Design a protein with these regions (language model features):
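N-terminal accessory alpha/beta regions
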Residues: 23-137
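Flexible, low-complexity segments enriched for small/polar residues
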Residues: 2-23, 245, 249-433
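A ubiquitous short alpha-helical element
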Residues: 73-77, 115-117, 161-164, 240, ...
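Short, compositionally biased low-complexity segments
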Residues: 8-16, 58-64, 79-82, 168-172, ...
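Active-site substrate-binding loop specific to GH73 endo-beta-N-acetylglucosaminidase modules
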Residues: 67-69, 87-91, 123-324, 328
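Hydrophobic residues in alpha-helical segments
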Residues: 29-30, 41-42, 96, 134, ...
């Protein structure tokens, strides 16, 4: 039998670097031990039977919005909503059903890192193209990812890059490129912001198609001075220059640590950056996932709404797009404050204890009630009543129940639906160990 410490470590691995266990998976991982579990969860998958065969979302270039008095306005708006719905549930299905969830988990992390919202972009195709870029590079090379992102139509539009000209510089993209995407706070100067904005001129987008075009005559072609280095740059070479700096290696390591290990105990082991020397994301994730800090009982972390919903859906064998009323999923994710493709700002979503509130607890109960109605409860209902509480912990990947939670669960021991509902809303499940 696994020790409590081993159980905690594996539970954290499964919930933080995946999206929680499928029925029976946690018990199997416990039997194999942490090293075997880490090898499974932290390795880059070569194939994924579901993801490799999933149909693509129905998204296309709709062209420009029709004039307000055009007869095409209604059909245009209807298709726009349908495309967003298709894209959203396509990704939720991938999160829930992918056999190797690390890639989707990291795609979700990078979506929050390069936070871009449909709220402003207002076209599904460029959001889809960005999402595919993030997925393609999610466990690849960060230099390549950054290069693709500074040439990404959705991000450029989101941060007003298309209005950045030599005569009228717009510094939004240049500032966030350094502060939020590659270097971090206090690792650049205001003069660096002004200079890097020049390197990002000349890029124009066709938003509905997600295409980016470079116009050399509209680009500042002279030398600029950035972080003490004078040279000529375009968007890609500027990105390479920033990512190559040691500050960038430390910053990305800090960000992954913050989201996967602890928001309360900042990174102090800077030796982890050596795993990121070549900007290999997979190597860094593997090093962080095997770090001893994963064992620290103090490093608990509240599940975000997406983490909670996706992990619950995996346990309950629910496919989001096949939910009887998919709008309920969208509405509850909105109420809980986290919906794919809608980060609140360029800084992305909050983390950890920011997700705890009286209102969120009420919405979570209501949402869980809907989920349980459509769940496969056989992993619990098939057990004898006196085995259900322990079986429930193994089903959901919970470390252990508190005496208070056990008492509540005991009261529902003969009602599998209520038992599942109580467990999904319990502190032990809402908080990742």
């Amino acid at each position: 039998m696994a020790t409590l410490a081993e159980r905690r470590r594996i539970a954290r691995l499964v919930h933080r670097f995946g999206f929680g266990p499928r029925p029976g998976e946690f018990s199997n991982l416990l039997a194999g031990g942490f090293n075997q579990a880490a090898e499974k969860y932290l390795s880059v998958p070569s194939q994924d039977a579901f993801a490799d065969n999933q149909d693509e979302p129905v998204v296309r270039d709709q062209g420009k919005r029709p004039a307000p008095n055009s007869p095409d306005v209604v059909s245009y708006a209807t298709e726009k909503r349908a495309q967003l719905t298709s894209l959203s549930f396509w990704w939720l299905d991938r999160m829930v059903l992918s056999e190797h969830s690390l890639r989707e988990r990291m795609t979700w992390f990078w979506h929050g890192h390069w936070a871009t919202s449909y709220q402003k972009v207002d076209d599904a195709l460029p959001m889809y193209l960005q999402n595919q870029s993030l997925r393609r590079n999610a466990l690849g090379n960060f230099a390549q990812m950054s290069r693709e992102m500074v040439n990404d139509a959705a991000l450029i539009f989101w941060l007003d890059g298309q209005t950045n000209t030599v005569k009228a510089p717009n510094e939004n993209l240049s500032r966030e490129l350094m502060e939020l995407f590659t270097l971090g706070v206090n690792r650049y100067s205001e003069e660096d912001v002004k200079e890097t904005a020049k390197a990002l001129t000349g890029y124009k987008i066709d938003k509905s198609s997600g295409q980016v075009n470079f116009y050399p005559k509209q680009h500042f072609s002279g030398a600029i001075k950035v972080l003490g280095t004078q040279s000529t740059f375009d968007a890609s070479s500027l990105s390479d220059f920033l990512v190559a700096r040691s500050d960038s290696a430390l910053f990305i390591t800090e960000r992954i640590w913050y989201r996967f290990i602890s928001t309360m105990n900042p990174l102090t082991d800077t030796s982890l950056t050596s795993s990121f020397a070549s900007r290999d994301i997979a190597a860094l994730v593997k090093a962080i996932g095997r770090h001893s800090a994963l064992d620290n009982p103090d490093n608990s972390m509240v599940k975000s709404p997406i983490d909670w919903f996706v992990s619950a859906s995996r346990a309950l064998s629910i496919t989001p797009s096949k939910f009887s009323n998919p709008n309920n999923i969208r509405n509850y994710l909105d109420l809980l404050g986290q919906r794919p493709f809608f980060p609140p700002n360029v800084g992305g979503w909050p983390a950890d204890q920011a997700w705890l509130s009286t209102s969120s607890a009420q919405y979570r109960i209501q949402f869980a009630t809907q989920l349980v109605k459509e769940a496969d409860l056989s992993p619990i209902s098939s057990l004898a009543p006196n085995a259900r509480i322990n079986g429930l912990a193994d089903w959901l990947g919970v470390v252990e129940w508190s005496s208070r939670t056990k008492m509540a669960l005991n009261g529902a021991i003969r009602d599998p639906a209520r038992l599942a509902l109580l467990a999904l809303c319990s502190p032990e499940y809402v908080v990742s160990a």
